[in-house]
């Protein structure tokens, strides 16, 4: 079922994924149960997000199964030309554009108007070069349920001293933060060499 959903994205949104970027886009580490996709940025489905780079995605097992604990549970990282410290407004505004564009691109029912996405975030912690955010994305599920859903979200924004840019890691799930789905999600992490140096050395 997951593969069917990925094919739908590929057809509907003209997602760019190429073997020549395979090494570059191996930005996240997760075990073999997680499916992977990569998307070129700017997004074809959300061109209003005006950055250049790549999105590296990991989908939990059962991402497309309504009855699975992994339903709509996934993570992605943006490796983009972003050199301004991100704020709650940045994430709220850009995730609205992202999900509105994605759901409208996937939607096949022209008789309905997709409701606008609502987002809310708070900055939770700042530790060295990592700033954490927590919040929600309320959006229309054009893939499976055809209903509004609320995704709980955490974001870790990493500052790379060598490249002088910020790299945000997003984790999403409709499950409560105490659910075991979040134990799985938190095991999806950035690779140590994502900043062309070791994450332990980021200051």
Please annotate each region the language model reported.
Residues 4-13:
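Sec-dependent N-terminal signal peptides
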Residues 14, 48-50, 158-160:
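Short beta-strand micro-motifs enriched in acidic
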Residues 15-19:
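Sec/Tat signal peptide C-region and signal peptidase I cleavage site
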Residues 20-58:
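N-terminal "mature-domain start" segment
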Residues 27, 60-65, 143, 155-156:
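Catalytic micro-motifs at enzyme active sites that drive phosphoryl/nucleotidyl and oxygen chemistry
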Residues 62-142:
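Conserved polar/disulfide-associated segments of primarily extracytoplasmic proteins
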Residues 128-202:
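Short, well-structured beta-strand
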